[in-house]
Amino acid sequence: MILVFDVGNTNIVLGVYEQKDLIYHWRISTDKSRTVDEYAVIIKNLFDLNGLDMSRIKAVVMSSVVPPVMPTLESLARKYFDVEPLVIGPGVKTGMPIVYDNPREVGADRIVNAVAAYHKYGGPLVIVDFGTATTFCAISKRGEYLGGAIAPGVGISTEALFQRASKLPRIEIVKPKSIIAKNTVAGMQSGIYYGYTGQVDRIVTLMKQELGRDTRVIATGGLAELIQEDSQEIETVDPFLTLEGLLLIYERNSNQQP
């Protein structure tokens, strides 16, 4: 079995693969202050709750946009799984050319998503990832990573309204009953929901003009399904795209089966 880590600014998503099947997945908070042992306790509890034996893990793969937490997680793999983790970054074989001014600037999560999406759907395509930031990645018909756009995430924008406007409350991010709201909470929900849906569609429309009409649009991340409800551009929501990309990259760097 193989254990994969998608380390984001807010959450770490973990997945366990047996062969090519994702048999378990979990989401825990990203905490730079946690020790190796504290992360190990959390993961062991998750394994125990699902009847999994940690000794069956034969490989660990990680992608991260949070460099400070990586020494801890890499030590976790060595100490508790007795393996050297494969960390996505320069020197790791992805099979995807990166056509970018400085390829090292591209977040590991964006490359992992691109690898998985091109493998599953072909190109050209646009990948929208709803995380702490909302990212838009363009992939050519030949499977080249072309670049994209980065916008503040839905959660960041919502929190900014609460923090910077003294009379505005924290809100749940949901689809409002009507775009014309009758109270403050509904008004904020309307602005956030339809504002982000419009933002996504506009950016994707412009990308498709450059990539071509046959461009497919794939979304992933926490709010992908919600935004897809009113999006005119998102075709498919693929919630485990990043985890699948981690498995693919592992396979391209190893002859062993997970």
Curated annotation (Swiss-Prot):
Active site: D109
Subcellular location: Cytoplasm
Highest taxon of the lineage: Bacteria
Cofactor(s) this protein requires: NH4(+); K(+)
Pathway assignment: Cofactor biosynthesis; coenzyme A biosynthesis; CoA from (R)-pantothenate: step 1/5
Keywords: ATP-binding, Coenzyme A biosynthesis, Cytoplasm, Kinase, Metal-binding, Nucleotide-binding, Potassium, Transferase
Binding site for ATP: D6, V7, G8, N9, T10, N11, I12, V13, T132
GO annotations of cellular component type: cytoplasm
Binding site for K(+): D129
Reaction catalysis annotation: (R)-pantothenate + ATP = (R)-4'-phosphopantothenate + ADP + H(+)
Listed GO MF terms: ATP binding; metal ion binding; pantothenate kinase activity
Biological process per Gene Ontology, one example term: coenzyme A biosynthetic process
InterPro entries per UniProt: ATPase_NBD, Type_III_PanK
Cystine connections: none
Main function: Catalyzes the phosphorylation of pantothenate (Pan), the first step in CoA biosynthesis.
The family this protein is said to belong to: Belongs to the type III pantothenate kinase family.
Subunit structure: Homodimer.
Protein name: Type III pantothenate kinase
Organism, as annotated: Desulfitobacterium hafniense (strain Y51)
